[in-house]
Amino acid sequence: MELNQPPLPTEIDDDAYHKPSFNDLGLKESVLKSVYEAGFTSPSPIQEKAIPAVLQGRDVIAQAQTGTGKTAAFALPIINNLKNNHTIEALVITPTRELAMQISDEIFKLGKHTRTKTVCVYGGQSVKKQCEFIKKNPQVMIATPGRLLDHLKNERIHKFVPKVVVLDESDEMLDMGFLDDIEEIFDYLPSEAQILLFSATMPEPIKRLADKILENPIKIHIAPSNITNTDITQRFYVINEHERAEAIMRLLDTQAPKKSIVFTRTKKEADELHQFLASKNYKSTALHGDMDQRDRRASIMAFKKNDADVLVATDVASRGLDISGVSHVFNYHLPLNTESYIHRIGRTGRAGKKGMAITLVTPLEYKELLRMQKEIDSEIELFEIPTINENQIIKTLHDAKVSEGIISLYEQLTEIFEPSQLVLKLLSLQFETSKIGLNQQEIDAIQNPKEKTPKPSHKKTPQHERARSFKKGQHRDRHPKTNHHSKKPKRR
């Protein structure tokens, strides 16, 4: 491999060096042409640090959050160094089929002018069809662990000596129970392969895996504080548990997002919320792990093509999705941890565009949100759920259907009230019952628990959102199996 970059240090933090352009990174003209045609202007921090290291043939361990441009960080140097020798030269292992397809699309796009051929291997697709694709001599294979291991055990992949192996979203593979599969897969791989490990977090099992499979790696760390950038406005709303679905509907009405993702904790919850929104005539679709492959792909395509503008999804199913134009992210519940929160809100505010991240919390989740806010070192603003405004009431009245029972009730009420008086009373009642979430006095009581809790206010709240800012807190050795390759020595 030709080395056209100066020697690199063994550790690179996100404050090192000035920011170069893609032209400074050592990429070929044909690759640069695809980069600029794809709309890239300058490298992200992870791309700036990783691309030269990969081009030099060094093993890399990189810690960076989802949404930082990791795919291009390993894809561009891989594409740059392909030899087109009719073998699988690079292997990318990733936790989910959606992410595998996303990476395959990205490599195809970035390899446009080098005619890069890829194959995507994942569960839920015909084994026979995958074998047919593999026989067409792709240069890059993108695979999920389970299906890849199945192909290797059954000796369905020939000419399999990848020079570069990428582990993407390594911590997610750990969470999904794939670590044993990963270690077994490495028994089939050439010991001299260049290994690139990418992970949002570095739990101990991932560190131990890195010690086993990486040789004198370049270490790259992009601080999480770079993720919660100023392009993403972060808000939260305090609600009662039973108000979640109504709160999402109200916020969709008042925020009017162009395209939004609503994250739920469970598959059942995703289905229920999607069905609720669809019943209210929202263009909604769902995405979760219990859906079959055809339905999952249909949901993603509907969202990409704007046939649906609300995607209700679980964390795992949406991992790695890179869909442009997402203006809003909603957390139906407070995420279970900071990593999940950062991953979720990273779906918006991309490529220099503005985004909005909104989280619904109950009074019981309030303290956990404050803890999370300190960890991400970013301000999250508190807002009240807006009340229904005049335009919404007019639209509701316009769309309402009048039944015979309502006509009968109207006749009874007009015997008691004048028609004009009746309308005023019904409108007043509508405004009173339209309130969702805690009002300002109730929220103040949560913020200052030592003070006497005021009685809930029944006065009409203003018909606009009132912001209240929160202050931030003070605050390889490998043992190769015999496949169709000869035995390989341990990597030291």
Swiss-Prot record:
InterPro entries: DEAD/DEAH_box_helicase_dom (IPR011545), DEAD_box_RNA_helicase (IPR050079), Helicase_ATP-bd (IPR014001), Helicase_C-like (IPR001650), P-loop_NTPase (IPR027417), RNA_helicase_DEAD_Q_motif (IPR014014)
N-terminal signal peptide: none
Gene ablation phenotype (knockout): Not essential, it can be deleted. RNase J remains associated with the ribosomes and polysomes.
Location relative to the cell: Cytoplasm
E.C. number(s) listed in UniProt: 3.6.4.13
Region (Disordered): 445-492
Matching PROSITE patterns: HELICASE_ATP_BIND_1, HELICASE_CTER, Q_MOTIF
The keyword Calcium appears for this protein: no
Binding, ATP: 64-71
Extent of motif DEAD box: 168-171
Domain Helicase C-terminal, chain residue ranges per copy: 231-393
Oligomer status and interactors: Homodimer. Interacts with RNase J (rnj), might be a member of a minimal RNA degradosome complex.
Protein family (similarity comment): Belongs to the DEAD box helicase family.
PANTHER family: ATP-DEPENDENT RNA HELICASE DBPA, ATP-DEPENDENT RNA HELICASE RHLE-RELATED
UniProt name for this protein: DEAD-box ATP-dependent RNA helicase RhpA
Gene this chain is encoded by: rhpA
